[in-house]
Amino acid sequence: MAIEFVPVLLGSDINAYSMARAFHEAYGVKTIVYGMFPASVCAGSRIIDYRVREHNDRVDKVLENVTEVAREFPDRKILVLGCGDNYLNAISANLPNYPENVIAPYVSLDMLETLIHKEKFYELCDRYGIDHPATVVYHKGMGHAFELPFDGPFVVKPA
C-alpha cells in the first residue's frame, strides 16, 4: 500500500513524539516535526524528520513551514496537526491560505475563539441542548460576597 500522506506535527514535546510513533507504527511513515529548539525528544529519532525553526508557533512561520512541506511533496496530502495549545491559533488562522494538498482538521479561527471562551462555549451548549457541568464564571467585580447556585463538591479552575 502506497502511503499518500505526510504527517506534519507542530511542536516537539513528548506529545509530538508519541503521535509520530503512532503514525510510524500504523503506517510506517516518517513524520515531519517542526520544533523551536535543537534539543528535543524528537531530535535524533529515526522515525522523525525533525526541523528546527525559530518562532515556529507564529502565524507566518506556520504557513511558511506547511507550505515548504506541501511543495516538497506535491503529490501527497499533507496532514497538519498541532501538538500544543500555542499552535492552534496559528493553524486555524492559516486555514484559507494553505496549499491545495494540505489538510488541517481544525475549525476557523472565529469558531476556535468562541469555543475556548468558557462563557461563549456554555452559551452554545445551552442553545443546542448539550449537557455541561453547572458553571459560574467569576468576574473580579463580584468581590467576595457572591453565592454559588449549586452545592459542592465542585472544581475551581482558572480560565
Q: Which role does the model predict for each range below?
A:
Residues M1-D110, R127, G141-A145:
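ATP-binding N-terminal substructure of ATP-dependent carboxylate-amine bond-forming enzymes
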Residues T114-A159:
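Active-site nucleotide/adenylate-binding loops and adjacent lid/helix of ATP-dependent enzymes
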